[in-house]
Curated annotation (Swiss-Prot):
Role, per record: Produces ATP from ADP in the presence of a proton gradient across the membrane. The catalytic sites are hosted primarily by the beta subunits.
Residues making up the signal peptide according to the UniProt record: none
Record Gene3D superfamilies: 2.40.10.170, Bovine Mitochondrial F1-atpase, Atp Synthase Beta Chain, Chain D, domain 3, P-loop containing nucleotide triphosphate hydrolases
Main location (coarse class): membrane
Protein name: ATP synthase subunit beta
Molecular function GO labels: ATP binding; ATP hydrolysis activity; proton-transporting ATP synthase activity, rotational mechanism
Assembly and oligomerization: F-type ATPases have 2 components, CF(1) - the catalytic core - and CF(0) - the membrane proton channel. CF(1) has five subunits: alpha(3), beta(3), gamma(1), delta(1), epsilon(1). CF(0) has four main subunits: a(1), b(1), b'(1) and c(9-12).
Subcellular compartments: Cell membrane
Originating organism: Heliobacterium modesticaldum (strain ATCC 51547 / Ice1)
Amino-acid positions noted as binding ATP in the UniProt annotation, renumbered to this chain: 159-166
EC number(s) on file: 7.1.2.2
Length: 471
């Protein structure tokens, strides 16, 4: 038993001194429990897990706490467990909800997992990687057409506060996880507890909870938990990929909070802050997480990550660092949300690696580029319209504007998960239908219909039917 003693507590960071030659390794889990203390007089029980982060010299280590450090005192005994934080993995974790340490938090008893894995692991080697070019159909028109997702790829949903990231990730869970019979892992990183609770209950009601493992480290938890909970969720997904050779879905909401937690402890660990006050190790930390979320020859991890954009600034170091790791980026725009168009995806800012004629086919590619071309032209004409009005445009430009406004509205779509709020039933639009609908608008087949007929419908037939009702 390797015991040390607490010599300093600074919020979530604790310094512990060990006997000479018995320093715990970096990333080892260290436990402080009231049961280990001699004549402990505190009013409540203490059971805190910390992670060794730095060796300070003088036989001391600086650790980051995974739960609140309330009640800690100098001189308390701390036990080096001799291993990193480890969480349960395998089929037994499905249908359950965990915290960062892998302890169940759904009040459904202990988890009888046969194996536990450490949360820190190496990324797969280069020769084991398996690039993918198969399109993952989401049933959301704007995504499938303009920034399609790859099976086994990494997707980022970027957006400021309140533009619909969480609703979009819930719709993707609804459309992909419900259609798809495999396993999913959901990691709630530093987001609202209420949303996690709602999601758990939705999974329960819809009957897909038996195929989902959930891990939460929410907003109210100390930065240590928020910094490591993404790794706890990831290791559960890695087990399904590497040992069971499954194709797994990994949902993370929100990657920005992972970076934010790192920056909260960075200064306490004595590092010099870098740009905008972030930790100097920002890109390393992001890389260590993202490089593990990948598809190998054994199985794949398809990941969807919501990424908060502080003050709507995509050049902020946190979202900017995440961009480099993704196969597809879906950018949510406040300007589009203000028009009442949901999902508020920016069709000109969102990108995908697989929007390529060799992957999606010539028809899909030409329709997608045609839609973007018209929307781009409309964007350029907006200044002229604002100053001189529509009448000053040429006949061709008037047609472009009319079609662009129809396309803009046709990119909106009612969601299943928002049905309770909007009263409109959600729509799943197959990719073929999306391509056909936009192709018809581009060809001018629906120039006679009012633009409001295209708002919040599924397929093009619904828009035509809506126009007839309005007439």
């Amino acid at each position: 038993m390797n015991f040390g003693k607490v010599i300093q507590v600074i919020g979530p960071v604790v310094d512990i001194q060990f006997p000479p030659g018995q320093l715990p390794e970096i990333y080892n889990a260290i436990k402080i429990r009231s049961a280990d203390q001699e004549n402990y007089q505190g009013s409540f029980e203490i059971d805190i897990t910390l992670e060794a982060a730095q060796h300070l010299g003088n036989n001391a280590v600086r650790c980051v706490a995974m739960s609140s450090t309330d009640g800690l005192m100098r001189g308390m005994k701390a036990l080096d467990t001799g291993a990193p934080i480890s969480v349960p993995v395998g089929a037994e974790i499905l249908g359950r909800m965990f915290n960062v340490l892998g302890d169940p938090i759904d009040e459904a008893g202990q988890v009888a997992a046969k194996e536990v894995w450490p949360i820190h692991r190496k990324a797969p080697t280069f020769e084991n990687l398996e690039p993918s070019t198969e399109v993952l159909e989401t049933g959301i028109k704007v995504i499938d057409l303009l920034a399609p997702y790859a099976k086994g790829g990494k997707v980022g949903l970027f957006g400021g506060a309140g533009v619909g990231k969480t609703v979009l990730i819930q719709e993707l869970i609804n459309n992909i996880a419900m259609e798809y019979s495999g396993y999913s892992v959901f990691a709630g990183v530093g987001e609202r507890t209420r949303e996690g609770n709602d999601l758990y209950n939705e999974f329960k009601e819809s009957g897909i909870l038996k195929n989902v493992a959930m891990v939460f480290g929410q907003m109210n938890e100390p930065p240590g938990a928020r910094m490591r909970v993404a790794l706890s969720g990831l290791v559960m997904a890695e087990y399904f990929r590497d040992v069971q050779n499954q194709d797994v879905l990994l949902f993370i909401d929100n990657i920005f909070r992972f970076t934010q937690a790192g920056s909260e402890v960075s200064a306490l660990l004595g590092r010099m802050p870098s740009a905008v006050g972030y930790q100097p190790t920002l890109s390393t930390e992001m890389g260590q997480l993202q490089e593990r979320i990948t598809s190998t020859k054994n199985g794949s991890i398809t990941s969807v990550q919501a990424i908060y954009v502080p003050a709507d600034d995509l050049t902020d170091p946190a979202p900017a660092t995440a961009f480099a790791h993704l196969d597809a980026t879906t950018v949510l725009s406040r300007a589009i949300a203000e028009l009442g168009i949901y999902p508020a995806v920016d069709p000109l800012d969102s990108t995908s690696r697989i929007l390529d004629p060799h992957v999606v086919g010539d028809e899909h590619y030409s329709v997608a580029r045609g839609v973007q071309k018209i929307l781009q032209r409309y964007k350029e004409l907006q200044d002229i319209i604002a100053i001189l009005g529509m009448d000053e445009l040429s006949e061709d430009d008037k047609i472009v504007v009319a079609r662009a406004r129809k396309i803009q509205r046709f990119l909106s779509q009612p969601f299943h998960v928002a049905e309770a709020f909007t009263g409109t039933p959600g729509k799943f639009v197959p990719l073929k239908e999306s391509i056909r609908g936009f192709k018809e608008i581009l060809e001018g087949k629906h120039d006679d219909l009012p633009e409001s007929a295209f708002y919040m419908v599924g397929t093009i037939e619904e828009a035509v039917a809506k126009a007839k009702e309005m007439a």
